[in-house]
Structures are given as structure tokens and as C-alpha cells.
């Protein structure tokens, strides 16, 4: 039922992109790199420079900022967004966080990475993004979230964000989703937090996360509803 619900809601979840193309995603394999290259190459609606799956940064800053404040032992705090696409999560943290953050967004779509680097640096007719804290930084890298060896060493990030990436990867089979989770936990600091944002029901997602996150604490928080849809933040945390 949760999978069916995701497909039915898919067109309404695509913010800042071409809706006819977004609607066709319900019939596609969301683990297909070429699909996302085509999606990220679509013209944006109006002046919106980003494309958000589910929701944007503003809807979850109330959850993220307290976590950043609690984890100020590392300054700036290292944040990794896996499967960042052209979402506003990375740019929102960079431009709006009052706490110093070192944000890295990775995606397997070179089209998405090129778009976000252009947005960061200020492409034609655009102003470069300015940090919310003078010590903050933002970078984007072309990389597969299921193999982060070229991105980071073990335990190097204090906060990991996954907004819809598990959902997309799992469409290619649960073993791939578990590989994604394993890589995220490998590069996560033992005292850090991984957050998966999804509309998948807890009775479906929690058993998977508990199985794949042995030794970590798994909890869930309800988010929204946003535009009539309830979402969930699945938090996987080490010892604090």
C-alpha cells in the first residue's frame, strides 16, 4: 500500500520542474541514472532553481537546526546529502544555517551536479550563493551513493541526509537499498545521525532499517502534512 501511495502522489511531489515528465516517473525505474539525467535537464517552472522530491529545506529546518546545534563539538559540522539531485536541502543549509556547516552533496547524475555547481557559483544572470555563517562551505560531487569510497573515509560526517534516495534505489531491489544504507553508516561518525526522509509508512521502513542498522538506534518522527501528505523522518543515530 505504501508503494502504491508513493506512485499515486508522485506528480504532486515534484516541485520546480516539468509536471508532465514528473507524472511519467510512476511508470519508470527510479534507480535508472539516465532517467534522472533527463529529469534534471528539464526546464524549471518560473524562477525556481531547484527541484525537490517530497519537500524542500524550509519544511525541515526545524528538525535539522537543533541537530546542528547539539553537534557543535565539530566545527564546522560535516554534512553529506546522498542523492542530492537539485534539491534545496544543501543550498538551504549553506545559506540559512546560523551554525557553521561543511556541506557536500553527491549524486550519480552529472547533469544534477553541474546544475548545482552553476547555482552555487552564480551562472549567467545568477548571483553566487552566500553562506549563512562565514565559516560554512558547500560542494557538489558526481558520485554513486552506493559506493562512497572516493568521497569520504569512514566516520567522517556528523550528519547524513537521504531525501527519497532509499525510495528510488529500492525500486531497483532491496539489496541495493541495503548497500546504500551500509555506505551511509560507514562514512557516518559513530556519534552522528543519518536521516531518511520518506512517505513510506513506518511499518514498512522501520523493519528494514533495524535489520540494516544493527548497533544503531532507529527512531521515527512524523512530518507535515505538507500539501496534504504526511511524511516521516527516520533517524539512525549512534551513541551520544
Swiss-Prot record:
> What does the protein in this record do?
Protein-lysine methyltransferase that selectively trimethylates citrate synthase (CS) in mitochondria. Seems to conduct trimethylation in a highly distributive manner rather than in a processive manner, and thus introduces a single methyl group per binding event.
Which EC numbers does the record give?
Answer: 2.1.1.-
Task: Output one GO MF annotation.
Answer: protein-lysine N-methyltransferase activity
Listed name of the protein: Citrate synthase-lysine N-methyltransferase CSKMT, mitochondrial
Q: According to its UniProt record, what is one Pfam family this protein matches?
A: Methyltransf_31
The organism encoding this protein is Homo sapiens (Human)
Q: Which GO terms describe its cellular component?
A: mitochondrial matrix; mitochondrion
Instruction: Output the GO biological process annotations, alphabetical, semicolon-separated.
Output: peptidyl-lysine dimethylation; peptidyl-lysine monomethylation; peptidyl-lysine trimethylation; protein methylation; tricarboxylic acid cycle
Into which family does the record put it? Belongs to the methyltransferase superfamily.
| Localization (cell) | Mitochondrion
Q: Which reaction does it catalyse?
A: L-lysyl-[citrate synthase] + S-adenosyl-L-methionine = N(6)-methyl-L-lysyl-[citrate synthase] + S-adenosyl-L-homocysteine + H(+); N(6)-methyl-L-lysyl-[citrate synthase] + S-adenosyl-L-methionine = N(6),N(6)-dimethyl-L-lysyl-[citrate synthase] + S-adenosyl-L-homocysteine + H(+); N(6),N(6)-dimethyl-L-lysyl-[citrate synthase] + S-adenosyl-L-methionine = N(6),N(6),N(6)-trimethyl-L-lysyl-[citrate synthase] + S-adenosyl-L-homocysteine + H(+)
Amino acid at each position: 500500500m505504501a508503494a502504491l501511495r508513493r506512485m499515486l502522489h508522485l506528480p504532486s511531489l515534484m516541485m520546480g520542474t516539468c509536471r508532465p515528465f514528473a507524472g511519467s516517473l510512476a511508470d519508470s525505474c527510479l534507480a535508472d541514472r539516465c532517467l534522472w539525467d533527463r529529469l534534471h535537464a528539464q526546464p524549471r517552472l518560473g524562477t525556481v532553481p531547484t527541484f525537490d522530491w517530497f519537500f524542500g529545506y524550509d519544511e525541515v529546518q526545524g528538525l535539522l537546526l537543533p541537530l546542528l546545534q547539539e553537534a557543535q563539538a565539530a566545527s564546522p559540522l560535516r554534512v553529506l546529502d546522498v542523492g542530492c539531485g537539485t534539491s534545496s536541502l544543501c543550498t538551504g543549509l549553506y545559506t540559512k544555517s546560523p551554525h557553521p556547516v561543511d556541506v557536500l552533496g553527491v549524486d550519480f547524475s552529472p547533469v544534477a551536479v553541474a546544475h548545482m555547481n552553476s547555482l552555487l557559483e552564480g551562472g549567467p544572470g545568477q548571483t553566487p550563493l552566500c553562506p549563512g555563517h562565514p565559516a560554512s562551505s558547500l560542494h557538489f560531487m558526481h558520485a554513486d551513493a552506493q559506493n562512497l569510497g572516493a568521497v569520504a573515509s569512514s566516520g567522517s560526517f556528523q550528519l547524513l541526509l537521504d531525501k527519497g534516495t532509499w525510495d528510488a534505489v529500492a525500486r531497483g531491489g532491496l539489496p541495493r537499498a541495503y548497500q546504500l544504507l551500509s555506505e551511509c553508516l560507514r562514512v557516518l561518525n559513530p556519534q552522528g545521525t543519518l536521516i531518511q526522509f520518506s512517505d513510506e509508512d513506518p511499518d514498512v521502513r522501520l523493519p528494514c532499517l533495524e535489520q540494516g542498522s544493527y548497533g544503531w538506534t532507529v527512531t521515527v518522527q512524523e512530518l507535515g502534512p505538507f500539501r496534504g501528505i504526511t511524511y516521516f523522518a527516520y533517524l539512525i543515530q549512534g551513541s551520544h
